[in-house]
Amino acid sequence: MILTNQNILITGCGGMLGLAVYNTFKVNNNVLASDIDQNEPWLEYIDVRDIESLFKISKSFKPDLIINLAALTDLEYCENHPNEAFVTNGLGQENICLVANTLNIPVVYISTAGIFDGEKEYYHDFDVPNPLSIYGKSKYYGELMTIKSH
């Protein structure tokens, strides 16, 4: 399914993946691209850890879809700052799910191979996660919040 003429909110859009997703969707849609680091003029400030601001922006922009790319991805930083990793990667996604459920908006959540322990050569969608790092555990928490909310 190709989305056209939709309002799409993309969080965590400041990195390489965010730029690629933004460029893909902006062609045929009205995109609000956001990040906590406004390193590009097309980025709006949104912090997924702030549920009140997520509600406010979602009520005014009225997205048809929310794509959450927001994450702390630096493995060493996450290990040294586990609370911040869980608040950003886990609670941030939980906040998005709460807003999305309240306003009836579908959500796309980007996870990581880091939810697996690396014992197998290949993993499938339904393999049992076993994250070893704080980063993997925090992203897995985000997955669980997404599953729980939908």
Name the predicted role of every residue range:
Residues N80-V108:
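NAD(P)-cofactor binding segment of oxidoreductase domains
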Residues I36-E52:
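Rossmann-fold cofactor-recognition segment
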Residues M16, N30-E40:
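Conserved glycine-rich Rossmann-like NAD(P)H-binding loop of the short-chain dehydrogenase/reductase
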Residues V87, L91-N95, I115-H150:
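Catalytic helix-loop patch of NAD(P)-dependent Rossmann-fold dehydrogenases
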Residues T11, S34, I66-A70, V107-A113:
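SDR active-site strand-loop-helix element
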Residues V48-T88:
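NAD(P)H-binding glycine-rich loop region in Rossmannoid oxidoreductase-like domains
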Residues I2-V27:
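N-terminal Rossmann NAD(P)H-binding glycine-rich loop of SDR-like oxidoreductase domains
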Residues F61, T102-L103, S149:
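Helix C-cap/helix->beta junction micro-motif
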